Amino acid sequence: MKREGCFWKGICMRYKSYSAYDSQGQSQIKEIYETSFPKSEKFPFWILKQCAKENNVHLNSIIDHNTDKIIGMSFLISYDDIAYLMYVAIDKKYRNKGFGSLVLKDLILRQADTSILLCIERPSTEKEDIKARRKDFYLRNCFYETGCFIEDSGVEYEFLSSSKERVITENDLKKRYSCMTRNPLIKFIIKNTFDSNINFID
């Protein structure tokens, strides 16, 4: 299903490929990425740019259709029957306005024939923990627990899915990295940035 944009509760937004921007627009997308994720969870941005040259990898801006301003970014990898949402972020100036919820709901509509997977840092048992609030946000917006937890470079992660009955396999997780690019050098860097061996935990 091809959709140019989406509208929900008075909010209207659309997407635009990173490669379609001039240097100023590209810098805005990079800044949102760099300021939205901890260093331990990020690839160097140039790797995202190179990987986005693949047909199955999408590095996009998220645009407020009413103002034509860049308000966020997303990085999505498609393989098999999975769309892996590696990164999605709304600029801090535009958070708590409904854009994040709209992005997730729209992605689920766009990827109706696939399971959207994403991972979050595993929450603690404290309800006020920011990680727990982040998880609750995804659960409120049509994502489900999968019971899949891994440890990578000393950080524990939990995987969520847009498909309620999705069973995540080791192969599913390995492919989220191996399908990012066909470039041997970048594959090597990716492999050495995050652990390519899947360490499942309880």
Task: Please annotate each region the language model reported.
Residues 88-95, 122-124:
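A short, internal acetyl-CoA/4′-phosphopantetheine-binding micro-motif in the GNAT/acyltransferase core
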Residues 119, 133-135, 139-158:
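Conserved catalytic-core motifs of GNAT/GCN5-like acyltransferases
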